[in-house]
From Swiss-Prot:
PANTHER family: RIBOSOMAL RNA METHYLTRANSFERASE, RRNA METHYLTRANSFERASE 2, MITOCHONDRIAL. HAMAP family: RNA_methyltr_E. GO terms for cellular component: cytoplasm. This is Ribosomal RNA large subunit methyltransferase E. The lineage of its organism: Bacteria, Pseudomonadati, Pseudomonadota, Gammaproteobacteria, Lysobacterales. It catalyses: uridine(2552) in 23S rRNA + S-adenosyl-L-methionine = 2'-O-methyluridine(2552) in 23S rRNA + S-adenosyl-L-homocysteine + H(+). It comes from Xanthomonas euvesicatoria pv. vesicatoria (strain 85-10). Specifically methylates the uridine in position 2552 of 23S rRNA at the 2'-O position of the ribose in the fully assembled 50S ribosomal subunit. The active site is at K162 (proton acceptor).
Length: 210
């Protein structure tokens, strides 16, 4: 157990020394992940006034908060999560599992006939510390997010998702290329260097999968 204790202490020390953690606390953002998204949104100019943005696995709300901040009062931000999330001004939150038809029906009722312009997913499993367990779980969540975008994202729309580099990630990116005109892999500055995470961005959703 001592090694785990040292590891936990090291993580806590790094966490509280992290400039993005300090920035999030100072600016009232719910998570440091908001700054990963901020860089990606600006770099690829993903947001336009009046867009409809869906944030999958949104809790604690850092990404939804960043999108609302970036778009001002225009457009709609719809956040979904199986975990509860305290209310955010200008964000519509749906609490539930989007794999369930009842939750999807609620989502569709919320949107009405309004098309979705951008689907975001920063979902990740609770880590066990074993790649053989964590990577398949991560890829399963990624598959679910891609299926959601297949169904709900409008033609020409964009899909941004967090992936862990490892078994299955290359195949997943190939699947994205069948669905989107342009696929780019990003590693934002706020992403910890030792983390296996990258962000895959699909732009220009095809009408039909190639």
């Amino acid at each position: 157990m001592p090694s785990r204790s040292k590891s936990s202490q090291r993580w806590l020390k790094e966490h509280f020394a992290d400039p993005y953690v300090k920035k999030a606390q100072a600016e009232g953002m719910r998570s440091r992940a908001a700054y990963k998204l901020e860089e990606l949104l600006q770099r690829d100019r993903l947001l336009k006034p009046g867009m409809v943005v869906v944030d999958l696995g949104a809790a604690p709300g850092g990404w939804s908060q960043q999108v609302r901040k970036s778009m001002g009062d225009s457009g709609r931000v719809v956040a979904l999560d199986i975990l509860d999330m305290p209310a955010l001004a200008g964000v519509e939150f749906l609490h539930g599992d989007f794999r369930e038809q009842a939750v999807l029906s609620q989502f569709e009722a919320m949107l009405g006939d309004v098309p979705v312009d951008l689907v975001l997913s920063d979902m990740a499993p609770n880590k066990s510390g074993m790649d053989a367990v964590d990577q398949p779980r991560m890829m399963h969540l990624a598959e679910l997010a891609m299926e959601f975008a297949d169904t709900h994202l409008k033609p020409g729309g964009a899909f941004l998702i967090k992936l862990f580099q490892g078994v299955g990630s290359d195949d997943y990116i190939r699947e994205l290329r069948r669905r989107y005109e342009k696929v780019t892999i990003r590693k934002p500055a706020a992403s910890r260097k030792r983390s296996p995470e990258v962000y895959a961005l699909g732009q220009g959703k095809r009408v039909q999968i190639k």
